[in-house]
Amino acid sequence: MMKHLIELKELSQIDIPEGASKLETALLVGRFAHSAFPHNGDNQPSSSDPITILKEAQAGASFRCVEYSHLAAWLMMAHGLEARTLNIMTKDVATEEYGAGHVVVEFYEGEEHGWVMADIQAGVVARYETKLQSALELSQSIDVASIEGFDGKRFTEPEGMFGGDYKEWLRPYLYFLDRSPKLNYEYFIDPEPHLILVPDGDSPPKYFQRTHKLDLVTVASDIFYCV
């Protein structure tokens, strides 16, 4: 695995200043991954590992939110951060045919911010008061949270993206939160059931968009967000 991480760092050539904090490092990686390729919700790489994603992106390919997040999470890992991809899904994910899921990244910043959600496709993080938000925190604070770019500036939705209102676009996706117990190099190879956070009174979905059977274990938030 270390060999892959070294190759990924060398291929990406992200300029991380000496002494950069975990947060600064994560945001620089996020900016790189966000700008690595144009978004195309219907295009997939020939293989789901991050080196293939980056090589094909450098050759001009465009990919989905999945590839933005998988690339960014592994680049964060390559630069010494704890990171993972997070599948966020709407309440009706089991019955919708399309557009019921989105993929983001969470990285562990430390004592000040804890786990931080970064939407690599959008190029943003969320903040409530002074604290950057995890996906779970944002599901509760989204009405009042601010959305900012990886450069710390206020986020302005690109024309034609996110329906012109990113928070309202994102809101329904924060219903189910699902992650693998560990970050896998090949995105689609998960030998273990995923962990999922389910709102009180509901149950985990059995399918993703009608066709893909889900293998999920419901856990408490302290387990989901353990370090």
Which sequence ranges carry the predicted segments?
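Hydrophobic/aromatic-rich core segments of domains that either
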Residues: 70-146
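Detector for Asparagine
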Residues: 40-43, 87, 184
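Secondary-structure boundary elements
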Residues: 1-63
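Extracytoplasmic/periplasmic, Sec-exported soluble proteins
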Residues: 17-25, 57-68, 96-97, 127-130, ...
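Enriched - but not universal
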Residues: 40-41, 77, 118, 172
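Long, hydrophobic/aromatic-enriched structural stretches that serve as scaffold segments
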Residues: 32-39, 67-71, 75, 79
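Intrinsic-disorder-associated interaction segments
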Residues: 1-4, 22, 131, 135-137, ...
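Alpha-helical and coiled-coil interaction segments, frequently adjacent to or embedded
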Residues: 141-227
